[in-house]
Structure formats: structure tokens, C-alpha cells
């Protein structure tokens, strides 16, 4: 139901789609302030979405979300949606996982987002930070949860094997942290890479998570008709494959981003939320339309979409399907 109160501890009630905030970073948008965020939030919340995902690392994202949510508070009270944000990543090469900074960052996020609590806080991109520092930051998040400042906490990152191992480790007595509540995985369940499917059971059963969130379903601009953004860390070969996939889709009168969106939703619906990055009302409505197309077909792809996906994965991506790129530092403690 729209505008229904949510239980911040019940992550199972997070909507199937989550409104993302990375698009408000200058990496993706030259003028984030020009995005009609208030209209986007109002439309999203009026059509079943009840969660946002942001981060201090995403430029002015928290500030812009905070302003928009504050302006909409009479129509959408704070207790009718989840706010998910992150801590620890400051810049492309700058991280601070100290307990003091984690605490400072959480309180700063509360101020920016005009809230007294955060529903979920992820430790941002853990693969870039040394293991002992990760543990200290997670212990501080546990303390903040015990104090009620945050309701849930977890980790985010790209290398799904390390993310899974770390989540499992936290659930052991040795960690002195306790089970995490959630993991946000990005670029691991999309048209080019579906490895997240192989790790979900471990994350839920062994790590005892409440929620596994799937983000970057267009693989940070790789899976779209426009050119892949320059900052994307994938190989030249994979970039070329994506370009070929876009051309193939165009020949079939299908947009690659639409197909990729439907694929990710069909694979993850019922398993966890999918984070959407939209920068306009048109993109939001298109994403919701794609969701409804999949939902109306029993949460499956149409036969045409299924054939297109199979061709792209087997005949275009070929050996580059499930190809990964380097991210983070070595973690020899992972066994």
C-alpha cells in the first residue's frame, strides 16, 4: 500500500524496487541539482516504491534527497519509507573506516537527510580497505544500531566472493560483530554477469542476512544504447561486446537498457530489492513499465526477451559473460 507505515527493522518489507542516489553523483550527471528529484520521489512513492539508497560518496545526493524528502514530509511522513545510506568512502581513492569517522558520518547523514535515524547503513566498498579496519568500522555500526541511531547495517561492494566471505565471517563468534542485516551487491546480477545468483543462498543461510540488494543493473552504463562511460573499469573487449549488444538490440527494435532492466528484475524479483538509478521522470516511468511487464508475465521474461538474452549472452558476450574487473586490495585473510 502507498503511504503505509513501515517497520524499520523489517527489511523484508522493502519494496521490490528502490530509488537509487548514485545518479546524483557528478560521475553520472553534470548538474545533479537539475534533476527533478522531488517529482521523481513523489511519483515513485505513489507507485509502490518505499525506499531510497544514497551515500555521502555520491556528491550532493544526501543533501538533495534530504531537501526533497523534507519538502514532501506532509504527503509522505518519515515513517512511510526506508532511508538507506553508506559510510566510509569519501572519494575515488579516499576511505576512512575509523570508528570516530563512522560515527560522525552517520550523524552527518541524519542531518543531511532531516531524520533522527537511518533505516540501513552500509559500510561502503569494503574491498578497498584492510580487514582490521573493516572490523572496527562494523563494530561501530553495531554500537550505533544498539543505540537506535541506525536500525540495520551491512556492507556493500563489488567482488561478490569477498563480500560473501566477509558477511559469513561476521556471523561467527570470532568476529565479535554478529550477523549483518544486509548486503548491497553491484554489477553482479545483470545481462552481462549473474554471479550473484550463486551466492544468494550462502548470504542468507550462512551469513544470516535479512536482505540482499542488487544494484547497478545496467552495470554502471555498460548495458545501454549510449556509449559506456569513460570511468568504467571493464576491459576493452567487454566494452566492445556491450556495444555489439546495443547494436543487436537496435536491429531487433529493442532498447538494450530496457532489456537489461527486465532481465535483472526477472532474475531478482522475490529474492531481494533492485536499486534503480533514474535521472528523469521519463526514466522512472520506463523502469516502472519494465517492472510491470515482467510482473504481468509471472515475474518471467517474455519468450522474445528470453531469446534475445540467450543470444546476447551466448553469442555476443561469449567468454566475456561473467567477466569481472579488478576492484579493491588483496585480502589474504579470505580462505
Swiss-Prot record:
Keywords: NAD, Oxidoreductase. GO terms for molecular function: D-arabinose 1-dehydrogenase (NAD+) activity; D-arabinose 1-dehydrogenase [NAD(P)+] activity. It is an enzyme of class 1 (oxidoreductase). The keyword Oxidoreductase applies. It catalyses: D-arabinose + NAD(+) = D-arabinono-1,4-lactone + NADH + H(+). InterPro entries: AKR (IPR020471), Ara2-like (IPR044480), NADP_OxRdtase_dom (IPR023210), NADP_OxRdtase_dom_sf (IPR036812). It comes from the Eukaryota. Its EC number is 1.1.1.116. One of its GO terms (biological process) is dehydro-D-arabinono-1,4-lactone biosynthetic process. The record marks 86 as: Lowers pKa of active site Tyr. The active site is at residue 58. Substrate binds at residue 124. NAD(+) binds at residues 221-287. Belongs to the aldo/keto reductase family. Aldo/keto reductase 2 subfamily. This is D-arabinose 1-dehydrogenase.
